[in-house]
Regions:
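Conserved Rossmann-fold cofactor-binding substructure of NAD(P)-dependent oxidoreductases
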Residues: 44-68
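Conserved Rossmann-fold NAD(P)-dependent oxidoreductase catalytic core, especially the SDR/UDP-sugar
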Residues: 69-77, 81-131, 135-139, 145
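Oxidoreductase cofactor-interface core, primarily capturing Rossmann-like NAD(P)-dependent enzymes
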Residues: 9, 16, 23, 115-223, ...
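Residues at the starts of beta-strands that form the adenosine-phosphate
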Residues: 2, 26-27, 46, 104-105, ...
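Mid/C-terminal beta-alpha module of Rossmann-like enzyme folds, strongest
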Residues: 2, 188-253, 264-308
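Mobile, glycine- and charge-enriched loop segments
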Residues: 4, 11, 59-78
């Protein structure tokens, strides 16, 4: 299958490429800077690299006409009116160029929590479903994997004693999902007609409070349980800036994570399991896997969860 990826530098995009290659797909990466991409990704030799800024339609290299499917993984979480307009323009240009190919299917990621989602993201979904390809939206809460925004945040929190956490996060209930399971769902949905023109909530098997998740994560990293200090308030902007400054996580991904921590984010339906019944990692398994492979994993060797 010939698959176009936009947003290849996002967390999921970076890990999706080697998985698709491993499954035998022909991967086409649309990037703003071809030289930078080729120099910084070891798998660049195995994919087709096209240049183009989705905010500038004329900069986009011609796409092959025989593209089968596409994944739109551009982050759309920064909540400003100016960014909303840019997010819409990016999606419109994407649909314009993809509409000139044989592409039958587009997959994008969304947010389980409607309260955490915002108009820019919902508008992008409307634009993506306006073209001729079928659209599949996979809504997630917290994604767990080595280098993910969630685990980078946990690492920051537990690196200091005592741990300082805003009060609004402590009792928030979440349904975290392993990054590898997100990748499996994306790959399994590609050109799967049962997934056409549908939205799915995807999550792991656990529903946990943020405090429970933090304690589980501490248990995989520390021999002594540190104390926890609860702050009365911490703004999304400040939290996102701190995470963006102290880790490799982008501001958009950090903001998405922080917004999710304000509200319960639990799957409202599980119909994806009727289509794709892959085994799912628990939060503890995901955290342990990330810890065990920390420092040894790269963009090409994220371990895959094998089906029995």
């Amino acid at each position: 299958m010939k698959v176009l990826l936009a947003g290849v530098n996002s967390y999921i995009g970076t890990h999706l490429i080697p998985m698709l290659l491993d499954k035998g797909h022909h991967v086409i990466c649309l990037v703003r800077d071809k030289t930078h991409f080729i120099n910084h990704h070891s798998y660049a030799y195995a994919v087709t690299v096209l240049g183009g800024d989705l905010l500038r339609r004329q900069s986009i290299d011609p796409l092959p006409g025989d593209i089968d499917a596409a994944c739109y993984l551009i982050n759309t979480f920064t909540q400003t009116s100016e960014f909303a307009a840019l997010a819409a323009l990016s999606a419109q240009n994407f649909m314009e160029v993809i509409g000139q190919t044989d592409c039958r299917h587009v997959i994008t990621l969304g947010d389980i929590n409607d309260k955490a989602s915002h108009k820019a993201h919902l508008n992008v979904e409307d634009i993506l479903c306006s073209g001729k390809p079928a659209l599949t939206v996979l809504n997630t809460a917290m994604i767990i994997g080595q280098g993910s925004a969630a685990l980078e945040m946990f690492n920051i929190l537990i690196s200091k004693t005592p741990i300082v956490v805003p009060r609004t996060w402590i009792k928030t209930r979440l349904q975290p999902i392993a990054a590898i399971n997100v990748l499996q769902y994306i790959e399994a949905c590609l050109l799967n007609e049962k997934a056409f023109n549908r939205k799915f909530d995807i999550g792991g098997p656990d529903i946990l409070t943020f405090k429970q998740m933090m304690l589980i994560y501490i248990a995989t990293h520390k021999t002594v349980k540190p104390g926890i200090v609860i702050l009365p308030f911490l703004t999304t902007h400040l939290s996102s800036n701190l995470l963006n400054t102290l880790t490799p996580v982008s501001y958009a991904e950090a903001q998405s994570l922080i917004e999710n921590l304000k509200h319960d984010s639990i799957c409202r339906e599980n119909s994806i399991r009727d289509i794709i019944a892959e085994p799912r990692l628990t939060f503890k398994q995901s955290a342990k896997l990330a810890y065990e492979t920390d420092g040894t994993r790269n963009e090409q060797n994220m371990p895959l969860l094998k089906s029995n």
